[in-house]
């Protein structure tokens, strides 16, 4: 409350100019011996491979593979995880893409491209993608609903998933 009163009484506070400027993170150089250098190296060598491995073992990729070939024969009760689990793949792609911009790694780049192939194949013809629905559009996961976006205010997580997919795309193509 007090800061609002002060800023209303002191209009110059709102007009001050910051003496710092943002720079693209790719222009910031860190030695591998620094705290952040160690952290990014650990992310590249341990965290990101583990996260991709978990996506594989927890069925995240298989949901995308099934979504690439939707079928009324798919029993959505056997869907791997929850309607928001597509984001595990997207967030891992995003983090890995940021790491690649500071510490290039051709093996990691190729792996990301292979995951992106799986994701792209799962998109519907108009670009829509939510594996919990796309796997079997006639009988989607109960959280998703029979029509796109119809349960967004409940549990479908369609916008949540879309937002994380866009974040991953931006990071990858920067």
For each of these PLM feature ranges, what is it?
Residues 10-174:
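Glycan-recognition and catalytic cores of secretory/periplasmic carbohydrate-active enzymes
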